[in-house]
Design a protein with these regions (language model features):
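GHKL-type ATPase core
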Residues: 1-77, 83
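Short, well-ordered loop/turn elements at secondary-structure boundaries
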Residues: 15-16, 49-51, 110-112, 176-178
Length: 178
């Protein structure tokens, strides 16, 4: 929407956080009715992607018998680790390794931070969820291609170093690890 006024300081407070109210502007948005379930899914996802923050959805369109509006909060202390666990659990996939593999790092020179959480499960198919700046990159991208290549390279190097592939009669490929 259009800002009503510039950001202004209101004074000191012992409260923290940001409160956002959203009312779609009919002159900007063609669709101004949103499904609560869609919003809940996105806010739940954001809570996993930003561990430690609480996001609350209040839907003033829906009130209970006491005129209290519908409200639901989303919070994740474990972040993307919990996200991977939830995705596997909701899909009925069983983890082959008891703990989610988690790696994070930041390049101080480029100021690029990366978080990776992965789980090997009993599903035949690969399920990759990738995000850049909290936006789901559904179609992948160079970051996903680079991750797949690196994962393959690391596993192949480890397997060769540990002589795990000596009896294999075929070339081990990336799909064998994914």
């Amino acid at each position: 929407g259009i800002p009503q006024y510039p950001v202004r300081e209101k004074g000191e407070s012992d409260r923290t956080g940001t409160k956002v109210h959203f009312w779609p502007d009919h002159s900007i948005f063609t669709a101004t009715v949103y499904k609560k379930e869609t919003l809940e899914g996105r806010l739940r996802e954001l809570a996993y992607l930003n561990k430690g923050i609480r996001i609350t959805l209040t839907d003033l369109r829906e009130v209970d018998e006491s005129s209290v509006p519908y409200s639901k909060s989303f919070f994740s202390q474990g972040g993307i680790i919990e996200f991977v666990e939830m995705l596997d659990q909701n899909a009925g996939r069983n983890a082959l390794i008891p703990r989610v593999i988690y790696v994070e790092g930041k390049d101080d020179h480029t100021n690029v931070a990366v978080e990776v959480a992965l789980s090997y499960n009993d599903s035949y198919n690969e399920h990759i969820y990738s995000y850049v700046n909290n936006i789901n990159t559904i179609e992948g991208g160079t970051h996903v291609s680079g991750f797949r290549r690196s994962l393959t390279r690391v596993f192949k190097h480890y397997g060769e170093r540990e002589h795990l592939f000596e009896k294999a009669k075929v070339e081990i490929e990336g799909d064998d690890f994914r």
